Amino acid sequence: MKKAIVFLANGFEEMEALGTVDILRRGGIEVTTVSITANPVVTGAHNVPVTADTTLEKVNLADADALVLPGGMPG
């Protein structure tokens, strides 16, 4: 099974990140959401808190076939 990592940073665009996660999972891709900080709870651009599957310090990037970087502010 193919694997993708979706990175989440505070201020991420919820629709870009979570819409992408949804579509990839529907397509049979194993998706892991990753907070770029030590805190797994990340707040999106519209103040929606999302709990990532894991954090950057715990993930092995070499396991992924694709890396997804959603947009957002502050950038």
Give the location of each predicted region:
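Extended, subdomain-level signal for the structured scaffold at the beginning of enzyme domains
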Residues: 1-75
